From Swiss-Prot:
Cofactors named for this entry: FAD
Annotated active site: E497 (proton acceptor)
Keywords, in A-Z order: FAD, Fatty acid metabolism, Flavoprotein, Lipid metabolism, Oxidoreductase
UniProt cross-references to NCBIfam families, sorted A to Z: FadE_coli, PRK09463.1, PRK13026.1
Cellular component aspect of the GO annotation: cytoplasm
Organism this protein belongs to: Escherichia coli O157:H7
Listed GO biological process terms: fatty acid beta-oxidation using acyl-CoA dehydrogenase
Pathway: Lipid metabolism; fatty acid beta-oxidation
Name of the featured protein: Acyl-coenzyme A dehydrogenase
Phylogenetic classification of the source organism: Bacteria, Pseudomonadati, Pseudomonadota, Gammaproteobacteria, Enterobacterales
Entry similarity comment: Belongs to the acyl-CoA dehydrogenase family.
Length: 814
């Protein structure tokens, strides 16, 4: 009985930690339990004495502070990693949303499902059905990329007329004031037609003058610029990146010096600016330049410090000394992008966004706004491109036949095709969920980094898979190619607004560990403020948090999550339970990593990256489950849900295993392995059988396939190869049973080619009627259009045709 009572006590302790019961209540329960065991004669009543001696200091604050918290506080202040001003501003910027729940080890799934699903307003839907549809029809991506290296003038004019550049600008200034969800849908639709079109519209609606002015501009700046930006009268760009500072944007060398100078014939207080920027989208054609630079005030003309820090100003490009116009040439996807320079350019101090009082506040302004733009524009562009590519590749895989069968029925094709379909579903779920948070007023900085990285990364991988499937059709550029420019341009999204290597290795967990953790940021603030009283309360909450996640990790690993709560009892029930387990694992691994590695964790980028991978996969899986719930839990969509969540579970577990295999403290790694994997690894990547189901969805028209491609431009217009493939898929499917019947009548397995000739012969023999013959003829036209590629006269391809030397006439000897 003694052994059983000890085991029962251990179970009780575990239950208290598991359910996160407060320290005081837990102490009372332990004392009552021990007393009950004493009354029952199982334990000596004297055990209460040492137990009370142990528990009293923990519950009596003055004693606890002097004996425990104060020494820990002193040690914490010594090992706390140094934080630069820019790092602090980045961490302080924005808010924590659903990713905070995932990070804390006990997600509230009901809260996730109660987040309201965004809906398009009638105005937003009309814009998508009208101006956006027309802009897509007008866009000829081959002409844009190969012939013009720009949007055609009539398309530029149309975008300005219909205020495409004003989606984020408030209506009081003449803007559209669309929701984040509507912006995402617009960009997805445009991206499926032309990457250049989507980038051109997306950038002014992301981080730039419009966004910064609305948040920080003076009334005079807003009244002057916002209506002009809304009408397209002004074209904005924002210059941050320089040759010496790319990912390390806080190290920009561009300078401004506060001084007096002549402006329009008068001596005014202003700034003398020198900059050298590159990779600036819309810079070659911009009329107003947003500029980030480091401002100093050596004469203290503003009355404050000398070194003011990063500042943002708005400068008309007609200002003397501003150099724009030259272009970069990014991967044959020639959107307007180029350098801008200026040397000793004098401008009034009022050109600072927000006026002189915002001098030195530029970095805070940027990071506060960046999470919104980064969370919408890049994920939406990548997602829209993949959604259209998914439909087109699925259609092509059905239409294209080799060895007398559709290539989509071959297992070698099914594997990448399933990845494309699964990624399209997951990316759309992830890109949509973050818009929910933004529409609720959140500025989820960590979540925007997750969505930016994984949508662009999965987008690139999906485009590569599509190229492998389509082969020559995807390689040969021309009017009928739906893939090659997306393939060429994929690295652009990978690189901009936080290069993906940086984002994964430093930003997701680097910010998430502090921003999403329930206690670390407040503990750091308490240490900075030398407030041991606040630190004491946080410390013991933190200790309970770690203990809870340790118990939860072990128990949920032992039971594979079977005892944890779930909001549903259907086919997705086990996924919630698995995610409960992984969330506890992440919380434990994060705390242990921070405790063992301390400030050096910032430099252990591969450890940080793997912790970020776990958090990211938890988000992607929860986004899939949220999408499935929001769309009515359609069982036909379950193959995509299974694929998305199983892929996330497998990758998260792989990241945990890799982390433990490479954890620098091998003793701690061994202990963590026992707690996290008490019965070993269990999650598998999506099976071949599941891949088969998912790949099949893309190859025939159905409701699930339509949901994958929701909102995309699928009209079979002249310059829309995706829409033409959709039309061809319907034509070929309509012809297939007629072809099979003819084969059966003739007793031959005829190839699915020359259907027009087959129609003529079968009609002559009375095997089919005229309507069926017409179906076969149309299918053959569509089939040939789908599999054929473009060819050109040599002169059409050369920007500078080679001039062959004139032949020298031979002079015969006399």
């Amino acid at each position: 009985m003694m052994i059983l009572s000890i085991l029962a006590t251990v179970v009780l302790l575990g239950a208290l930690f598991y359910h996160r019961v407060s320290l005081f209540i837990s102490s009372l329960i332990l004392l009552a339990w021990t007393a009950a065991l004493g009354v029952a004669g199982l334990w000596s009543a004297w055990v209460l004495v040492p137990l009370a001696i142990i528990l009293v200091p923990f519950n009596f604050a003055p004693m606890r502070k002097s004996m425990i918290s104060a020494p820990v506080f002193r040690g914490f202040r010594k090992v706390m990693p140094p934080m630069s001003r820019t790092e602090k501003e980045a961490i302080d910027a924005g808010t924590t949303w659903w990713e905070g729940d995932l990070f804390q080890g006990k997600p509230d799934w009901k809260k996730l499902h109660n987040y309201p699903q965004p809906r398009l307003t009638a105005e937003e839907q009309a814009f998508l059905d009208g101006p956006v549809e027309e802009a897509c029809r007008m866009a000829n991506d081959f002409q844009i990329t190969h012939e013009l290296a720009d949007l055609p003038p009539e398309l530029w004019a149309y975008l300005k007329e219909h205020r495409f550049f004003a989606m984020i600008i408030k209506k009081e200034y003449g803007g559209l004031e669309f929701s984040a969800y509507a912006q995402s849908r617009v960009l997805q639709k445009l991206s499926g037609v032309s990457g250049i079109l989507a980038i051109t519209v997306g950038v002014p609606n992301s981080l730039g003058p419009g966004e910064l002015l609305q948040h920080y501009g003076t009334d005079e700046q807003k009244d002057h610029y916002l209506p002009r930006l809304a009408r397209g009268q002004e074209i904005p760009c924002f210059a941050l990146t320089s040759p010496e500072a790319g990912s390390d944007a806080g190290a920009i060398p561009d300078t401004g010096i506060v001084c007096m100078g002549e402006w329009q014939g008068q001596q005014v207080l202003g700034m003398r600016l020198t900059w050298n920027k590159r990779y600036i989208t819309l810079a070659p054609i911009a009329t107003v330049l947003g500029l980030a630079f480091k401002l100093s005030d050596p004469e203290k003309l503003l009355g404050g410090a000398e070194d003011l820090g990063i500042t943002c100003a708005l400068i008309p490009t007609t200002t003397p000394g501003v150099e724009i116009g030259r272009r970069h040439f990014p991967l044959n996807v020639p959107f307007q992008n180029g350098p801008t320079l200026g040397k000793d350019v004098f401008v009034p101090i009022d050109y600072i966004i927000g006026g002189p009082k915002m001098a030195g506040q530029g970095w805070r302004m940027l990071v506060e706004c960046l999470s919104v733009g980064r969370g919408i524009t890049l994920p939406s562009n990548s997602t829209g491109g993949v959604k259209s590519v998914a439909l087109a590749t699925g259609a092509y895989a059905h239409i294209r036949r080799q060895f007398k069968i559709s290539i989509g029925k071959m297992e070698g094709i099914e594997e990448p095709l399933a990845r494309i379909a699964g990624n399209a579903y997951v990316m759309d779920a992830a890109a949509s969920l973050i818009t929910y948070g933004i529409m609720l007023g959140e500025k989820p900085a960590v979540l925007s980094a997750i969505v930016k990285y994984h949508c662009t990364h999965r987008g690139q991988q999906s485009i590569i898979d599509a190229m492998d499937i389509t082969g020559g059709k995807g390689i040969m550029l021309g009017q009928s190619n739906f893939l090659a420019r997306a393939y060429q341009g994929a690295p652009i999204a990978i690189t901009v607004e936080g290069a993906n290597i940086l984002t994964r290795s430093m930003m997701i967990f680097g910010q998430g560990a502090i921003r999403c953790h329930p206690y670390v940021l407040e503990e750091m603030e308490a240490a900075k403020n030398n407030d041991v009283n606040v630190f004491d309360k946080l410390l013991f909450k933190h200790i309970g948090h770690v203990g809870s996640n340790k118990v939860r990790s072990f128990w949920l690993g032992l039971t594979r999550g079977l005892t944890s709560s779930t909001p549903t009892g259907d086919a997705t029930k086990r996924y919630y339970q698995h995610l409960n387990r992984l969330s506890a694992n992440l919380a434990l691994l994060s705390d242990v990593s921070m405790a063992v590695l301390g400030g050096s964790l910032k430099r252990r980028e591969r450890i940080s990256a793997r912790l970020g991978d776990i958090l990211s996969q938890l988000y992607l899986a929860s986004a899939v489950l949220k999408r499935y719930d929001d769309e009515g839990r359609n069982e036909a969509d379950l193959p995509l849900v299974h694929w998305g969540v199983q892929d996330a579970l497998y990758q998260a577990e792989q990241a945990m295993d890799d982390l433990l295999q490479n954890f620098p403290n091998r003793v701690v790694a061994g202990l963590l392995n026992v707690v996290i994997f008490p019965t070993g690894r269990h999650y598998l990547a999506p099976s071949d059988k599941l891949d088969h189901k998912v790949a099949k969805i893309l190859q025939v028209p159905n409701a699930t396939r339509s949901r994958i491609g929701r909102g995309q431009y699928l009209t079979p217009s002249e310059h829309n190869p995706v829409g033409l493939l959709e039309e061809a898929l319907v034509d070929v499917i309509a012809a297939d049973p007629i072809h099979q019947r003819i084969c059966k009548e003739l007793g031959k397995n005829l190839p699915f080619t020359r259907l027009d000739e087959l129609a003529h012969n079968a009609l002559a023999k009375g095997l089919i009627d005229k309507d069926e013959a017409a179906i076969l003829v149309k299918a053959e036209e569509s089939r040939l259009r789908s599999i054929n590629v473009d060819d050109f006269d040599p002169e059409e391809l050369a920007t500078k045709p080679v001039k062959l030397p004139e032949k020298v006439r031979k002079v015969e000897a006399a």
